[in-house]
Amino acid sequence: MNKTKLRAIQNRQYNAEREAMDTWAKRDLNIEKLTEQVYQSSMQHITDEVDAFYLRYANRNGVSIKEARKRADTMDVTDYFQKAYEAVRDKDFSDEAEEWLRVYNLKMSTSRLELEKAKINLELLKMYSEIENITNEQLEQARLAEIARQTDLIKEYEEQSGILANSVGNPTDRLKGVVNADFYGANFSERIWSRNGHYASLRKELFKSLNNLSVDMMGYRRERNRLMKIFNTSKYESMRLIRTEHQRVNMQVQHEMAVANDFTHYTYVAESGACSICKALAGKTFKIEDYEMGVSAPLMHPACVCSVYHHIEMTYDNGKKTTDDMDIASKDDYI
């Protein structure tokens, strides 16, 4: 291989990664649309519950929530239950009976704060379960697609470089675990369901709004607006996590297959509009043993869609190596 041929191969590799970035961006838009639909549906159900909670507390009795709760709490519960039962049985819907029923319902409402929380909790569980299922399906599709893409790229590289190989190495067992692999100490499922995960964080904020409403109905509009902001923030964070997981899968597949096929180096390819961190790495070539996500390889930050292409170091007839003219860097330079 001569320098001209090597440069042509590298140009094709670079262009292949930039084309892949466009494909990944379209894929991320599709998953974001699905996630948006799930969030919008759940947000509608939950805000409906909050609205109903407010109406049950405030509107039915025409009194302040403090006074309404006081009425319920000072009534003899046993005696009241009997009166309420008799009113329903006898259809005695006088103003007085209706007031009894309203206060009875209010008593159930004050004790139903936990029931409202349970309803919202169930909706959150359904929402995040659906997001997890959709994401895992998309990640598995991304894994298989990247395996196929890398297989084709490796074959092309070997043919163009004159490397004789019977087949492309495929570390099947290692690639199977890519989707559920840890990334900075946690996998996707743990980032959703752990004690400090997305589900627990959003649930905590929603319950806080319910608690606030139960003691201060005058703040209903404020709490409802706060609720909408919380949901939108949570949606953004979930989408960012999904984009990050997608690219993590791509990068891990690339690296595992590069190692299995004896590649010695890789070159960093920054996305268009890359941040200053990624721009500083663009075009840098590292030894394969220096590969470390977040230090010398993508992902350098959440939702990073930069990539790499790989190279096998060879020796020219004149004794020089194919890596001699590359911008070689060390992981230690970026720690």
Map each language-model feature to its residues.
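Activation/maturation switch segments at domain boundaries
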Residues: M1-Q138, L227-F231, Y236-I335
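Structured, charged N-terminal subsegments at the starts of enzyme catalytic cores
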Residues: W100-R226
